[in-house]
Amino acid sequence: MADPKFQFLPYIAHDQPDVYETPDAPESETSDFYDEEPANESIERLHISTKDSYNKFKGKYLTGNVDFSDRIGKKIRNGYDAVSGEWDLAGEGEKETPIQKCLRLQCEMNELMEEITASQADATKTKEEKASYEAVFDVVGTAKKVLESLKLEQAIGSETVAMGAETEAKKLLTKIEEYKKSVGADPAKTATELVYSSRIAELEHRLHELEVAVGAKPEKISRLAGSAGAGNLIEAVQSISAKAALLQPQQLDLIETRLGNLLLKMAAIDEKSAATGQDANREQKILELYEIAKTTEPIVQILPDMLNRMQTLESLHKYATNFSKLFAELETTQASILKGIASNKTLLTGVQEAFAQNLENVNKEVKKLDERMKTLQEKVK
């Protein structure tokens, strides 16, 4: 029987039960297999490679200091941050050493420079973005050079650097021992590695000797090349060797004879200048001219621009002078016109006065004529 609370509602079947059960669907209609529509363009199909995904996230781990809340604050709250690689950092509560800081900064700068070079090679980037990348690359390169030229032995002491190097060497030895225990040693491989390591050590020793002889800083090399008048170090060495070849005994005799001839010529020139008697005043004037030229040397660079500007302003100055002349002529004509107007005004006042007087006389004569006409009319009657 239907619920009595629905008895006053319309369209309610009171003679039927309140609960209805649908029959169970067949298994053919409840299959979990989803048949895609291959020809439907509205469905976006993503082709994801499991191998590429595995290689992308291989060796990465998640940090535990995360915050997924949406609270507002000064600190930016992010989720998990995936990081890769092995870092030899200081432990929790331990202070980072200067050597660890230096190595970490070098590694980060190398990674940043690699990312910038990769982004510069991208063809989709605009010229402005590439220019900004180049500026950042230059700044990072200079910072890297400064970091490489930093002498830790002078800054923090040779003992601290030696202790850091000893700890690094001990860690390396422990890793080598663990590797030897885990993997069987191959004699051929170890021999080649020893040859390579000895060769690398020899090259590093030669590089160190070259840096000691020439200098590790690029400023010294550029100063040497600039003083020698060469573009690179090889040309500077060649020019220095050529100059050193001139200092041989055979060349020194030739140089001495040439210098003797030059001294004789200089003495003859001094005698001629003393004979003319124009030495004191002439040298004084030459010195004054030289001082004037020296003082006006910074203005010489601005003179071409000033001349060009004066040439461009010449037409404007001519137009201004013509305008001033026309304005003066206009003032003179205006003054003459004002004088003519004043004289015409006086003449007009005189004409008006004469016209008024003549009009008054005419009126008097007309009155007299009227009176005579009246008298004549009376006589005629």
Curated annotation (Swiss-Prot):
Coiled-coil spans in chain: 100-216, 350-381
Annotated segments matching region Disordered: 15-39
Keywords noted in UniProt: Coiled coil, Cytoplasm, Cytoskeleton, Dynein, Membrane, Microtubule
Alphabetized Pfam families for the sequence: Dynamitin
Membrane topology: Peripheral membrane protein
Predominant location category: cytoplasm
Compositionally biased intervals (Acidic residues): 24-39
GO annotation, biological process: mitotic metaphase chromosome alignment; mitotic spindle organization
Subcellular location: Cytoplasm, Cytoskeleton; Membrane
InterPro entries, per the entry: Dynamitin
UniProt GO cellular component terms: cytoplasm; dynactin complex; dynein complex; membrane; microtubule; vesicle
Subunit structure: Subunit of dynactin, a multiprotein complex associated with dynein.
Role: Modulates cytoplasmic dynein binding to an organelle, and plays a role in prometaphase chromosome alignment and spindle organization during mitosis.
Family as reported in the entry's similarity comment: Belongs to the dynactin subunit 2 family.
PANTHER family xref list: DYNACTIN SUBUNIT (PTHR15346)
Protein name: Dynactin subunit 2
Annotated source species: Aedes aegypti
